[in-house]
Amino acid sequence: MELSQLTAISPVDGRYAGKSVELRSIFSEYGLLKYRVEVEVRWLQMLSANTKIEEVPAFSDTSNALLDAIVANFSVDDAMRIKDIERTTNHDVKAVEYFLKEQVASNSELSAVNEFIHFACTSEDINNLSHGLMLTEARDTVLLPYCDKLIDALIALAKEYQHIPMMARTHGQPASPSTMGKEMANVAMRLKRQRAQIAKVEILGKINGAVGNYNAHLSAYADVDWHSESEKFVTSLGLSWNPYTTQIEPHDYIAELFDAVARFNTILIDFDRDVWGYIALGHFKQKTIAGEIGSSTMPHKVNPIDFENSEGNLGLANAIFNHLAAKLPISRWQRDLTDSTVLRNLGVGVGYAVIAYQATLKGISKLEVNEQSLLNELDNNWELLAEPIQTVMRRYGIEKPYEKLKELTRGKKVNAEIVAEFIDNLDMPEAAKADLKALTPASYIGDAIRLVDQL
């Protein structure tokens, strides 16, 4: 059976293929081979630039242009050729080396030094840098832009709903009012902080040989400062240098990165669930789309499917991220191979996250606040004013203010008249009474509006 969206085992490449297409060139087998080719080529070019490595003279402009073109024009056909070679070698990185030897065979200058392709490298020197490039591109071109879209969408909601009061709920029960805008601002600021954490994780790389000590490098060129060359090469790729490793770069930074992404996702799950609840309460309506069906048997249904889809896919993403973060920093002695198969799933976690981000954004775009529903709820809960009344009573030295309001309101239905009568009987200045009587559940929102202004 041929692979297609209908026959793919993973929904990332099946049902949701259109939502994850931007990740294919980064996390696919083609993507990994593309980065490996880039690392191998740049390493060869760096060797040629080192005057102490006389056996690899400085390359001519023509030869450097050929090498640059191999990187820039790397194609699916090139990747397929590498896979053909791998069928013989049964070694994926060695297949890249042999592919490059084929590519430079027609250039006498490069073919003369083709044994310096993959010089002194262990496979993990190439792989860790390839994964670093992969994660850098994914973070910079996919993850962070989606983070920004989500944060911007929530800030826009916060501004739009800035003046719309709502009854808050703690423990699921009525609590002091807020505004819908302020509640959106809370989420935006939480996401903003985690976005900054994601952005500042240093993506590390190493190129120091089979056990991290430059053994092979020094055996051939003892007078080369390989520490300096290693740092210069890794940073030239846009990565941060890790000078202390075993055979593998220990992947601690991958755990840091995915832990930060998982926290971002967890906040988004919290948001998805809250909006789901507000829709259930009638506080949000959803714009309907012609032709869409909400239920196979109940024609009236308009379900919060986007937020449900997001929640489910974020859970899958975090399950993968959590495993990667827990597993990858652990490798027996100087290395075992358990990280290899796990690292092939970097894109799976990111894929589920990206699918979820798109679902949340779609859900947000369909939201319409039901202001009347929010106002009705506030008007049905005048007991919310127990808090400001007992607080002002404390100011004026009235005995047992909390207890008196508890007696008036706890477990009871209170209306405007009952609240006004209670205030009239208080021993406090008339101006203070007037201020309290002017309060309504809808106006008792504290500094919620100004807090949105400060976003």
Regions found by a protein language model. Give the residues of each.
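A structural signal for small-residue-enriched, beta-sheet-centric alpha/beta enzyme cores
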Residues: S123, L218-Y221, S236, S240-I248, ...
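Generic, well-ordered alpha-helical scaffold segments in large soluble proteins
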Residues: R42-L47, F99, Q103, A138, ...
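Glycine-rich cofactor/substrate-binding loops
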Residues: M1-K34, T62, I85-T89, G282-F284, ...
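Short amphipathic alpha-helical segments with heptad-repeat character
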Residues: T136-L144, D148, I155, A185-A188, ...
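A helix-coil-helix interface module used to build multimeric assemblies
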Residues: E2-H217, Y221-K232, G294, F307, ...
